[in-house]
């Protein structure tokens, strides 16, 4: 467990997990659902393969309607448009079978004009089967009617080359199978879909949730309408209009041009030649309703003044300010705890990928004792199922994943370390 705690951060860093985490959390805040994908990418590290963690576009993911847990869906489909040239280079059997995509995928509105004429829809189909009392996850990748890869058709037995000593004491290289073929074991040994959902505001009977845009767009639309009305009324009052008699003697062009100090008139200037059109100002209750709507939006989305560090003028006690901040951060704490739970599931899935695929020793640079760099070698030998005695019972190591937060800013680190340093100093003085 200690070794895993040291090498898993290396794996996350190789996947730029900070950016992946940020992108997924932005997706969660805006749309209500963030999805991570934990895969085994055989093309990584020059064909050796390694774990790949990527954000997943929830618009391209399809599951069984009515389920609240992705793992309970019988089938899961992930659709993606890929370039025809890339597909032909990887799968020559697709020659003459590719064309413009006829399927309509939900896409985000962008300023760029996206050309889909040279792209083809590729479907990744994940499905589960019960075999021998256990759940097996199978995978099929296809384009149109052509199957590109299917685990049920994969009979290849993975093996590694190891050096052994025979009966005569000579060293020989032998091929040792490390696991069964994919047609028997499936895609991943844990039997779970490689997708992790993180919801902001859960919806009953759905895997997805509401985002801040969903819960705040109603009040925001009303605020925008009232704000437009107030601005329009202000502009109308600032730029008055005039009624002019058809036989009026005032030069309109000169009267409308404020840069000209003189306005020419013909004959006597009567009071009824020009008359200003009166604009009724909006009553004060309109501004009050607008402010109330703004406060409603703040409380609905949890973006209150207390959350941003501002308190009412009458609140001065530190305990009262702390109580207000504690009460105002309930929604953010719930969202953070949800992200922690999703992150724990992601780490457990990473451990399962290590257990299944790290057959050969790999070198990692970790932080050793005293903060010094240390290079260690690790493989999955101690993670696999092990015999427990003559009864031929097998046990698989299981790990507890605990997520703890760390303050990122230097100021908070200094503020929290100051009491510790002071206590340490006082202990030496006494």
Q: Which sequence ranges carry the predicted segments?
A:
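Extended alpha-helical, oligomerization-prone segments that build pores/tubes and scaffolds
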Residues: 1-429
């Amino acid at each position: 467990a200690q070794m895993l705690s040291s090498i898993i951060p290396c794996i996350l860093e190789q996947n730029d997990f900070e950016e992946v985490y940020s992108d997924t959390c932005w997706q969660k805040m805006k749309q209500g659902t963030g999805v991570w994908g934990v895969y085994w990418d055989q093309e990584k590290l020059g064909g050796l393969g390694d774990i790949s963690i990527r954000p997943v576009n929830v618009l391209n993911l399809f599951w069984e309607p009515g389920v609240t847990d992705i793992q309970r869906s019988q089938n899961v489909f992930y659709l993606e448009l890929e370039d025809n040239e890339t597909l032909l280079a990887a799968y020559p059997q697709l020659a003459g079978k590719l064309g413009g995509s006829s399927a309509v995928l939900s896409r985000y509105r962008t300023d760029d004009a996206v050309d889909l004429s040279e792209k083809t829809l590729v479907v990744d189909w994940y499905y589960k089967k019960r075999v021998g009392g256990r759940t097996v996850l199978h995978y099929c990748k296809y384009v149109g009617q052509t199957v590109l890869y299917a685990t049920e058709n994969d009979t290849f037995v993975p093996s590694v080359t190891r050096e052994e000593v025979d009966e005569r004491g000579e060293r020989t290289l032998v091929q040792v199978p490390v696991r069964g073929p994919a047609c028997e074991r499936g895609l991943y040994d844990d039997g779970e879909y490689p997708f992790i959902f993180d919801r902001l505001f859960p919806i009953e009977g759905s895997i997805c949730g509401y985002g801040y845009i969903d819960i705040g767009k109603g009040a925001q639309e009303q605020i925008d309408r009232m704000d437009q009305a107030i601005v329009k009324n202000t502009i109308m009052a600032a730029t008055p209009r005039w009624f002019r008699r058809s036989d009026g003697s005032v030069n309109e062009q000169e009267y409308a041009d404020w840069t000209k100090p003189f306005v020419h008139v013909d004959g006597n200037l009567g009071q009824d030649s020009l008359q200003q059109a009166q604009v009724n100002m909006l009553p004060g209750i309109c501004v009050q309703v607008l402010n109330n709507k703004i406060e409603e939006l703040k409380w609905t989305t949890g973006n209150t003044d207390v959350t941003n560090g501002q308190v009412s003028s009458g609140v001065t006690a530190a305990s009262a300010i702390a109580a207000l901040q504690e009460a105002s951060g309930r929604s953010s704490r719930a969202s953070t705890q949800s992200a922690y739970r999703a992150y724990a599931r992601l780490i457990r899935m990473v451990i399962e990928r290590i257990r299944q695929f790290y057959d050969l020793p790999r070198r990692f640079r970790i932080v050793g004792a005293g903060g010094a760099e240390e290079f260690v070698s690790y493989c999955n030998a101690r993670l696999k199922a092990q015999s427990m005695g003559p009864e031929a019972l097998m046990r698989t190591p299981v790990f507890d994943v605990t997520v703890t937060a760390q303050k990122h800013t230097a100021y908070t680190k200094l503020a929290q370390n100051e009491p510790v340093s002071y206590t340490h100093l006082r202990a030496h003085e006494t």
